[in-house]
Amino acid sequence: MKNSENDYIQSLFQILPGLLTAFLVACLSKFLAIWLPSLGAATIAILLGIFLGNTFVRGANLNRGTKVAESKLLEFSVVLLGTTVTFQTIAQIGLQGVAFILIQMSLTIIFAYLIGKKLAFSDNMSLLMAGGNAVCGSSAIASIAPAIQADEEEKGQIITLVNLLGTVLMLTLPILSGILYGTNLLARSALIGGTLQSVGQVVASANMVNENAVQLAMLFKIMRIVLLVAVVYLFGRFKQSKTAESEAELVEVTKKSSALPWYVVGFFIACVFNSLIHFPVVISETAHFFSSWFEITALAAIGLRLDFKKFFQEGKRFLIYGLSVGTVQVVLAILLLALLQF
């Protein structure tokens, strides 16, 4: 009994330095967001984490805690997001908006996967890149990774790439949408909400347009989040089928049920309950508060764990992959918005 208690205390002390560091960066980001509202706390947390993690705040003693902050807090954030989403909310963007999101997500997944395979990335990394860009960035990657049995290195590399890509798009899409659509707020919001990776990036980017754009962009983003469960399930089945085919065990594998990660199931249950009974405002606001803090702390941890040296050691392939997927994703969105006459 004493040994288990000592192990627990020792484990806690190993986690605390990195976890507290990520939380302090999140607090500083929240404070700086007061003076830089156009960026937002989520964006600042990533950028500040990247800067500090590659300069002053470095050390192996932080790794375990930042890893917990990055993974576990994102998992809880996914569940809490479900309490702020309803199926009724989706109706506000209309059939036109639903069609845009469904086609945009499908094409993003297909092209991101094909580009990844063309550049000789593994199935896991190509699927993580596809899901992270199509759905909700790090949260989607955290949900998809266990379903396709991706390892920590694959997950970390793609989270880094997706967050870097999202940060670039977050700063450029408000300008691009203004040039293309002018005062057409719905089209600008659709481009931002239908393309950007994380919720924080959507809010930060839409804030650079105006407050109304935030509400509209989040409706498009919510639609993508609602489809997270379906994407995780389909990716898991796709990976199982490929594995089974390579091992000539397809029949045996298809008989086994695909267990979704607990936080994906939790998100779906919360979303259904909120759609049917509508959680009281105090519950939704409390959940949103904690979800926001969890996400910002996790984003700070992701930034702290982003090692530029390691990223550049991967070579030009990663840079080409990110730029290719980002370009295709934005071009597809622009073409779809034109075809659907937004």
UniProtKB/Swiss-Prot annotation:
Annotated transmembrane regions: 13-35, 40-62, 93-115, 125-147, 159-181, 213-235, 262-284, 289-306, 318-340
Designated name of the protein: UPF0324 membrane protein EF_0922
Family under the similarity heading: Belongs to the UPF0324 family.
Superkingdom of this protein's organism: Bacteria
Cellular component per GO, a single term: plasma membrane
A Pfam family it matches: Cons_hypoth698
Topology term for the membrane: Multi-pass membrane protein
Subcellular localization, as worded in the UniProt entry: Cell membrane
Chief place where the protein resides: membrane
Organism: Enterococcus faecalis (strain ATCC 700802 / V583)
Keywords linked to the UniProt accession: Cell membrane, Membrane, Transmembrane, Transmembrane helix
